[in-house]
A protein has these predicted regions:
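Soluble "head" domains of membrane/secretory-pathway proteins
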Residues: 2-17, 32, 36, 41-42, ...
Length: 178
């Protein structure tokens, strides 16, 4: 093999190795972003109708609750102890709150809480006083949501929050903040 052919072969090999290395770095960066910073979730189910509907893809940030606590009204990703998967709900009750739901009205610490995002009235009245490090999460579709009113989800500790939903990214016709 001539020197010229050998040099061409080495150059192609170096270019290929450079390309593979760049691809591996890009994959590693994407995985780190997915694992620690951002997540895309496809909505399945009706519990957050009409805010989020089946088929919506939402962008969630995973770092929001590293340095601060969930706030009332946040749409959040949660993991429920003993249940598989990630759920999307809205934070309604904070530690120490008394939450009363009567029909289509919600009261927090005896004051009416306006919820323009709720699509229908609750399936039943509900009263709870939250303890220290307890949060109440509910779906916006109060009649059909499986949420903090149900014993298998219940009141959640702060470490159950895995991220905050920021916007709908798909379908494009619904693109925007939540």
């Amino acid at each position: 093999m001539s020197d010229r052919a050998e040099k061409r072969r080495r150059k192609k090999r170096r270019e290929m190795l450079r390309w593979v290395r760049s691809l591996l770095i890009a994959v590693a960066v994407a995985l780190c972003i997915k694992m620690f910073l951002l997540d895309f979730i496809r909505i399945a189910g009706v519990s957050m109708n009409d805010t989020l509907v089946t088929g919506d893809v939402v962008l969630a940030t995973k770092f929001d609750y590293w340095f601060s606590s969930p706030q009332r009204g946040d749409i959040v990703l949660i993991s429920v102890p003993g249940r598989e998967g990630t759920f999307v709900k809205r934070v309604i009750g904070l530690p120490g709150d008394e939450v009363i739901i009567q029909g289509d009205s919600t009261f927090i610490n005896r004051a009416y809480y306006d919820e323009p995002f709720v699509s229908n009235e609750a399936r039943e009245d509900f009263i709870v006083v939250l303890g220290e490090n307890e949060y109440l999460v509910l779906g916006d579709n109060r009649y059909s949501s499986h949420d903090g009113r149900d014993s298998d989800i219940g009141l959640l500790p702060e470490n159950a929050f895995k991220g905050r939903v920021r916007c709908i990214v798909s379908p494009f016709s619904r693109f925007g903040g939540v």
